[in-house]
Amino acid sequence: WVRGFDEVDLLYCDSVAHVGWIKDIVRRKSVYRVTDCLAGFQKTTPVALELEKELAGSVDLVVYAARSLEDYVKQLMPKSMAYLPNAVNYAHFGQQSCARPPEYDAIPGPIALYVGAMDVWFDYRLLDEAAARLPEISFVLIGPDALAKQRLRARPNLHLLGKREYRELPRYLQHADVGLIPFDVANHSELVRSIHPLKLYEYFACG
């Protein structure tokens, strides 16, 4: 199923779904990147955990994105491991004077913005309470929001804009007043404490 690759210099894997690559692709070196504690996701199966261990033990190097993942990676028993934190594409997110998003014309400021996935580990209760207590602030969410629509009450200062293209994100961030990372530490501590959010650097780059 893999065509056009007699041999690759570096085989980069970032999902347990890539374990088949290790068996099928000839490579000089291979890397598996761990960005989250897979065991912390509710839907992770025992089979997925076994596949991750197999993948981690097969590659030349396992890199992990957060210091808090070090012990988790150690128990995967890799041949070699190294800390490689997230970083921002500054050329993209640090660009100056992006045009104001047209949606913001109908949203009064100040704007508190979240950009990213909204899954079970998102703290919907906290966000709902913040929106209720701070009616003068507009809370804007960008990203796949099917679950958010189920769990958040409709409020005049809560705006779910849905998914936006990656190329458009800097302007939404630049014209917001504060960036949010409302993750549910109380109920998903293992997962949340292992996260080193890329969005944090994107927020910083946009000022």
Q: How should these model regions be labeled?
A:
Residues 12, 23-39:
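Active-site proximal beta-strand in glycosyltransferases
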Residues 68, 84-96:
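Carbohydrate-associated surface elements
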Residues 94-106:
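A short helix/loop element that forms part of the nucleotide-sugar donor recognition site in Leloir-type
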Residues 148-178:
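Nucleotide-activated donor-binding/catalytic signature segment of Leloir-type glycosyltransferases, i.e.
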Residues 21, 40, 59-83:
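A short, active-site helix/loop in glycosyltransferases that binds the activated sugar's phosphate group
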Residues 104-122, 127-131, 139-142:
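Conserved donor-binding/catalytic core segment of Leloir-type glycosyltransferases
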Residues 1-6, 45-65:
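Membrane-proximal helix-turn-helix segments that form the acceptor-binding/catalytic region
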Residues 167-171, 181-205:
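Nucleotide-sugar-dependent
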